[in-house]
């Protein structure tokens, strides 16, 4: 084998035909140019992060004329039993890596409209919240929900909710003039309920305890409510400060059987006294003759 048949960056034991180096270089130059034509700033950042990750794992990077680094996997010698067969496996590794990058970039470009405003680091920690962002409208141009998650807590925060723009006008907080609300039908408590329940105010201090400061000069009247006076004679305060020197006698409280025996004795005495005014009952036949109940009609 001539020295030109050995590749400069390949490890020992890896031999490729001389045409593979030029062919691989041309393919790598064509593929990134085709991809870079439609790349945005987010996709370029993503490809740079992927290349850094592959370089940290021990892969080599080939620099294209457009200034972008395309990562390429390299074979690692694990022992004498593992060897890379001659042919084009290295070229297929280049093509597979490039195809994976194209697939990832196309996927990120499709979801770019709904996920561009959110940080990329939080996707692994909160997968449920990011799944809500994939809900698109029928046209697929704008997200159906406006969603601003709070990553510091478990609360899902919706800024506006569902999109409510009709012909460029937000109608989410508009009310119809024909709408009959509860306030219009029944009123509100603070306007329709009287705290005094219709009782007129008599004195400056005569006001409800909930709003004492609303009456002018309420503190000048002394007490909040004047003493109640139901008579013409002016009220005189009586001092009830008598302290007895001996215990007061207990109020007699007789049991029930004693009271019942006294009542029965009183009834017997009253019945005996009524015997002095006793009169015999009127005969029944006499009562019938007087009433005319025994007069039969005569037969002719």
Curated annotation (Swiss-Prot):
Keywords: Phosphoprotein. It holds the Pfam family SASRP1. Residues 1-42, 64-91 are annotated as: Disordered. The modification Phosphoserine is found at residue 113. The keyword Chaperone does not apply. Residues 64-85 have a biased composition (Low complexity). InterPro entries: SASRP1. Residues 27-42 have a biased composition (Basic and acidic residues). Residues 1-10 have a biased composition (Polar residues). This is Spermatogenesis-associated serine-rich protein 1. It comes from Homo sapiens (Human). The lineage of its organism: Eukaryota, Metazoa, Chordata, Craniata, Vertebrata.
């Amino acid at each position: 084998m001539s020295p030109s048949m050995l590749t400069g960056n390949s490890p020992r034991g890896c031999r490729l035909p001389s045409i593979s180096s030029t062919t691989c270089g041309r393919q790598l130059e064509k593929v990134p140019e085709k991809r870079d034509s439609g790349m945005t700033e987010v996709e370029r950042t993503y490809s740079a992060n992927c290349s850094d990750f592959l370089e940290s794992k021990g892969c080599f990077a080939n620099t294209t004329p457009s200034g972008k680094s395309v990562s390429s996997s390299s074979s690692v010698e694990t022992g004498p039993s593992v060897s890379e067969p001659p042919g084009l496996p290295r070229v297929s590794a280049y093509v597979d890596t490039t195809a994976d990058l194209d697939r990832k970039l196309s996927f990120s470009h499709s979801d770019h409209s709904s996920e561009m405003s959110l940080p990329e680091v939080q996707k692994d920690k909160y997968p449920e919240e990011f799944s809500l962002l994939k809900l698109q409208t029928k046209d697929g141009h704008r997200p159906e929900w406006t969603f601003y998650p709070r990553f510091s807590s478990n609360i899902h925060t919706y800024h506006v909710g569902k999109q409510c723009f009709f012909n460029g006008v937000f109608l989410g907080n508009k009310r119809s003039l024909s709408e009959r609300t509860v306030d219009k039908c029944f009123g509100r408590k603070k306007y329709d309920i009287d705290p005094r329940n219709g009782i007129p105010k008599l004195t400056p201090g005569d006001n409800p305890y909930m709003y004492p400061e609303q009456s002018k000069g309420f503190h000048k009247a002394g007490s909040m409510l004047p003493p109640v006076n139901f008579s013409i004679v002016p009220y005189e305060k009586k001092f009830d400060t008598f302290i007895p020197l001996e215990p007061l006698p207990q109020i007699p409280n007789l049991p029930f059987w004693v009271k019942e025996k006294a009542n029965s004795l009183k009834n017997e005495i009253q019945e005996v006294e009524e015997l002095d005014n006793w009169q015999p009952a009127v005969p029944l036949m006499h009562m019938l003759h007087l009433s005319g109940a025994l007069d039969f009609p005569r037969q002719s």
